Amino acid sequence: MAQLEEVSIDQYKHLVSERALTGETMLLNMGPQHPSTHGVLRLLLELDGEIVVNCIPDIGYLHTGIEKNMEAKTYQKAEVMTDRLDYMNTMGNNLSYVKKKEKLIDLDVPARAQALRVILVELQRIASHLVLIGTWGLDLAAMSMFLYCFREREQILDIFELVSGQRMMTTYIRPGGVWRDVPVEFEKAVRDFLKIFPKRID
């Protein structure tokens, strides 16, 4: 097993100001365990008293070697791993992956499947943004905002469950189309969501 190397200021000298190197300002690590970063990044902050004068982001904490692991998988098994790249955007990750496969073999996708993909990826984007906004509110102690956002997100996850059998990690979008056609209740479920969501935003 590889040993972890000690991180020294020498690795960051070229990124921070002279004031930080002389001790006039303070360098502070925020994350990757800080409650407001949700474990996916580290921020090296340069502080002058209580004022942040510089911020160096380190976003490498989300990388889990998935790309390397996918090299040893069949294309069907590899797609399941795209759900885990960003669990808030599984449909978008599936789509990005299968679009490359389709381009590689010059595969045409039926118009209905293309439309379903767009609808589901856009719903996924809304659900992802609701988590973002809700957790921002939670970080500011706005519990109600968090609960409102998650209430709307639940309705979207219900639609995903209706379509794919899963609320998250759906692996629904497949090369050449989608896993299966949507059930008859799909249109009503989406229309019901679209009817209430604009009012709830206001």
Language model features with spans:
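Active-site bordering "gate/hinge" segments
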Residues: 1-42, 46-202
